[in-house]
C-alpha cells in the first residue's frame, strides 16, 4: 500500500471521492501552474489545496532566495487562490534557533509573510511531544 494510504488508515481517515492526493508536482513557473489549473477544472468543487512542502515547488538553481523571490512564489499561489476562491495552504519549515517573535523562526525572508493573507505557525516544546500550539497572524 502507498504511504498516503497507510497514513489515512493510521489516522482513521475514511476513503472518499472528495479527497485527492498528488505525490508529484512541477515547479512554480514550470508545470505547477498548469497542474493546479487542470486540477480545479477537473474538480470544480475544490476548496483547499495543500502544498507540502513549499521547497518542493521552488525553482532549483543559482538564484539565492530573496525577499523578491519569496514574495513572487507566494504571490503566484495567492493569485491562483483568489482567482478560484479557494485556500492554498503551503507547508514550510522553521529555523531551529529561537526568536523573539515566533514568526521570525520561519525559514526564508519576510516576503513569505508579506504576501500571504495569513500565516499559521505550529510549534512543539519538544519534537516528540504530542501537543503543539498554533500561532496565527493575518495581513489585515
Predicted regions and their residues:
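Phosphate-binding/switch region of NTP-binding enzymes
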Residues: 48, 67-140
Amino acid at each position: 500500500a502507498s504511504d498516503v494510504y497507510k497514513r489515512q488508515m493510521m489516522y482513521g481517515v475514511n476513503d472518499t471521492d472528495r479527497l485527492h492526493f498528488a505525490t508529484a508536482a512541477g515547479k512554480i513557473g514550470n508545470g505547477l501552474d498548469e497542474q493546479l489549473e487542470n486540477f480545479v477544472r477537473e474538480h470544480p468543487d475544490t476548496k483547499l489545496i495543500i502544498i507540502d512542502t513549499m521547497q518542493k515547488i521552488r525553482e532549483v538553481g543559482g538564484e539565492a532566495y530573496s525577499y523578491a523571490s519569496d514574495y513572487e512564489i507566494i504571490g503566484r499561489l495567492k493569485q491562483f487562490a483568489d482567482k478560484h476562491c479557494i485556500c492554498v495552504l503551503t507547508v514550510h519549515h522553521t529555523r531551529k534557533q529561537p526568536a523573539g517573535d515566533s514568526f521570525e523562526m520561519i525559514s526564508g525572508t519576510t516576503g513569505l509573510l508579506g504576501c500571504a493573507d495569513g500565516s499559521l505557525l505550529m510549534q512543539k516544546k519538544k519534537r516528540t511531544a504530542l501537543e503543539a500550539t498554533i500561532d496565527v497572524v493575518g495581513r489585515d
